[in-house]
């Protein structure tokens, strides 16, 4: 039943008093004298133009998907009697009554929830909001719903009159309602097309399908199943096709909207990689794009800096002269190669290169000098195990050690000379003894 909520204590004529300062009238002329004498609300200034901007009614609502309202016309319909007599059963509702209740609920809710008042009341028609062009769409929708309900109620009253063919008339009325519902369902957009993801509620029953809407639901289900099973397999966008041809221009426009919605949803699912592959199907295999970035190689000069906190090195062989020559040759060769590979530069760039080369050579010279000090330190017995010996100490200890070594050398040379003389004497004595024995 429609939910009609009316407030009897509210006077809708007072609505004009709140907006009266916004309407400008000439003081010499009284345009609303006749209306005030008849105690009617004066019309709004936009009364002559609101018909030009009358809005069209809203699109048809989607059919209900409840299981109690989804019985087809093939099921035997028992007539309903509001008096509760024996032939109607009193407590059972026929398909026509259920569909009428749904229609009344949908229409009544749309009007009564928008305006909390009775649509049959005169104050509802006289309200200034209805006469305004911005609110004309609601009045047009209410008028359309009321006319449709009135025609259905008149048909039901004719069918409810006592006659021998009462069951047949109720069945025909129910088939009329079912045809109207199927037409509305065919005009509506299937929610599964707009929202193609499966619902979690698997226990909810499916909506009733009429012969006209069964083809649409079958085609949409097959389209969705093919899209969900292989969303990336088809490179071309899928388009929604209906088996039933469109009857009006509004149907064709809604079909175009359905097609656009479906194309957008399918194209969003395709990754950019698949689109590129679909754009060029002749390219075979996983061929990489011809992308060869320019890599500029920079020469790396190995710089060795001594770590004083590191443990003592056990390496004793330091061919300093050869290493200096080889490193200097290698660095100069790398610098010359870099100059050959690069393009001719300006004078500033050449100066920077010279400065960089000088810094590299100077750093290499210092490293070699440091290595020489380390080698000298390792040769001194007193500083052999001292990793943190300064250079001055190394030089002093090295000088002392060299002098001591030279003194030892002179001593050993003198001893050698004495031993050689002793040998000569012994040889001469042995020769004399041999001659005496002979």
UniProtKB/Swiss-Prot annotation:
GO terms for molecular function: DNA binding; DNA-binding transcription factor activity, RNA polymerase II-specific; E-box binding; protein dimerization activity; protein-containing complex binding. Residues 412-433 are annotated as: Leucine-zipper. Keywords: Acetylation, Activator, Chromosome, Cytoplasm, DNA-binding, Glycoprotein, Isopeptide bond, Nucleus, Phosphoprotein, Proto-oncogene, Transcription, Transcription regulation, Ubl conjugation. Glycans are attached at residue 58. Residues 210-237, 278-287 have a biased composition (Low complexity). Its main location: nucleus. Residues 353-405 form the bHLH domain. Residues 335-346 have a biased composition (Polar residues). It comes from the Eukaryota. InterPro entries: bHLH_dom, HLH_DNA-bd_sf, Myc-LZ, Myc_transcription_factors, Tscrpt_reg_Myc, Tscrpt_reg_Myc_N. There is a cross-link at residues 52, 143, 148, 297 (Glycyl lysine isopeptide (Lys-Gly) (interchain with G-Cter in SUMO2)). The modification N6-acetyllysine is found at residues 143, 148, 157, 274, 316, 322, 370. The modification Phosphoserine is found at residues 6, 62, 71, 81, 151, 159, 161, 292, 313, 328, 343, 346-347. The modification Phosphothreonine is found at residues 58, 314. It is found in: Nucleus, Nucleoplasm; Nucleus, Nucleolus; Nucleus; Cytoplasm. A motif (UBR5-degron) lies at residues 354-363. GO terms for cellular component: cytoplasm; nucleolus; nucleoplasm; nucleus. Phosphorylated by PRKDC. Phosphorylation at Ser-328 by PIM2 leads to the stabilization of MYC. Phosphorylation at Ser-62 by CDK2 prevents Ras-induced senescence. Phosphorylated at Ser-62 by DYRK2; this primes the protein for subsequent phosphorylation by GSK3B at Thr-58. Phosphorylation at Thr-58 and Ser-62 by GSK3 is required for ubiquitination and degradation by the proteasome. Dephosphorylation at multiple sites by the PNUTS-PP1 complex promotes MYC stability by preventing ubiquitination by the SCF(FBXW7) complex. Ubiquitinated by the SCF(FBXW7) complex when phosphorylated at Thr-58 and Ser-62, leading to its degradation by the proteasome. Ubiquitination is counteracted by USP28 in the nucleoplasm and USP36 in the nucleolus, both interacting with of FBXW7, leading to its deubiquitination and preventing degradation. Also polyubiquitinated by the DCX(TRPC4AP) complex. Ubiquitinated by UBR5 when not forming a heterodimer with another bHLH protein, leading to its degradation: UBR5 recognizes and binds a degron that is only available upon heterodimer dissociation. PROSITE patterns: BHLH (PS50888). One of its GO terms (biological process) is regulation of telomere maintenance. Residues 265-277 have a biased composition (Basic and acidic residues). Transcription factor that binds DNA in a non-specific manner, yet also specifically recognizes the core sequence 5'-CAC[GA]TG-3'. Activates the transcription of growth-related genes. Binds to the VEGFA promoter, promoting VEGFA production and subsequent sprouting angiogenesis. Regulator of somatic reprogramming, controls self-renewal of embryonic stem cells. Functions with TAF6L to activate target gene expression through RNA polymerase II pause release. The 9aaTAD motif is a transactivation domain present in a large number of yeast and animal transcription factors. PANTHER family: MYC PROTO-ONCOGENE (PTHR45851). Efficient DNA binding requires dimerization with another bHLH protein. Binds DNA as a heterodimer with MAX. Interacts with TAF1C and SPAG9. Interacts with PARP10. Interacts with KDM5A and KDM5B. Interacts (when phosphorylated at Thr-58 and Ser-62) with FBXW7. Interacts with PIM2. Interacts with RIOX1. The heterodimer MYC:MAX interacts with ABI1; the interaction may enhance MYC:MAX transcriptional activity. Interacts with TRIM6. Interacts with NPM1; the binary complex is recruited to the promoter of MYC target genes and enhances their transcription. Interacts with NUP205. This is Myc proto-oncogene protein.
């Amino acid at each position: 039943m429609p939910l009609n909520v009316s407030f009897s204590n509210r006077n809708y004529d007072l609505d004009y008093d709140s907006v009266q300062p916004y309407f400008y009238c000439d003081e010499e002329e009284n345009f609303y004298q006749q209306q005030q004498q008849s105690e009617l609300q004066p019309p709004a200034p936009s009364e002559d133009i609101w018909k030009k901007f009358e809005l069209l009614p809203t699109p048809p609502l989607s059919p209900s998907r409840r299981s109690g309202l989804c019985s087809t016309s093939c099921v035997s319909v028992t007539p309903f009697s509001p008096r509760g007599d024996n032939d109607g059963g009193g407590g059972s509702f026929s398909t026509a009554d259920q569909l009428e209740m749904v229609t009344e609920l949908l229409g009544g809710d749309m009007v009564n929830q928008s305006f909390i008042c009775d649509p049959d009341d005169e104050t509802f028609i006289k309200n200034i909001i209805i006469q305004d062009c911005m609110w004309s769409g609601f009045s047009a929708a209410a008028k359309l719903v009321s006319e449709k309900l009135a025609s259905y109620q008149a048909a039901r009253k004719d069918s409810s009159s006592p006659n021998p063919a009462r069951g047949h008339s109720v069945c025909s009325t129910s088939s009329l309602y079912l045809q109207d519902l199927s037409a509305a369902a065919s005009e509506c957009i299937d929610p599964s097309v707009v929202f193609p993801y499966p619902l979690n509620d698997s226990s909810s029953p499916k909506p009733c399908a009429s012969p006209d809407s069964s083809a649409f639901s079958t085609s949409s289900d097959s389209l969705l199943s093919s899209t969900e099973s292989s969303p990336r397999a088809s490179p071309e966008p899928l388009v929604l096709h209906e088996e039933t041809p469109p009857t009006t221009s509004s149907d064709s426009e809604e079909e175009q909207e359905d097609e656009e919605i479906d194309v957008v949803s399918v194209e969003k699912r395709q990754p950019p990689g698949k689109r590129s592959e679909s754009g060029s199907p002749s390219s075979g295999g996983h061929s990489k794009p011809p992308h060869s970035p320019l890599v500029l190689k920079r020469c790396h000069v190995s710089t060795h800096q001594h770590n004083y906190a590191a443990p003592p090195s056990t390496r004793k062989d330091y061919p300093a002269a050869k290493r200096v020559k080889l490193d200097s040759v290698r660095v100069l060769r790398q610098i010359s190669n870099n100059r050959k590979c690069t393009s001719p530069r300006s004078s500033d760039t050449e100066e920077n290169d010279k400065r960089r080369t000088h810094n590299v050579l100077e750093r290499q010279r210092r490293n070699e000098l440091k290595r020489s000090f380390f080698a000298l330190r390792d040769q001194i017995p007193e500083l052999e195990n001292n990793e943190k010996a300064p250079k001055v100490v190394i030089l002093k200890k090295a000088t002392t050690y060299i002098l001591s070594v030279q003194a030892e050398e002179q001593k050993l040379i003198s001893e050698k000379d004495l031993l050689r003389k002793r040998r000569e004497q012994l040889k001469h004595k042995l020769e004399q003894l041999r001659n005496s024995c002979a």
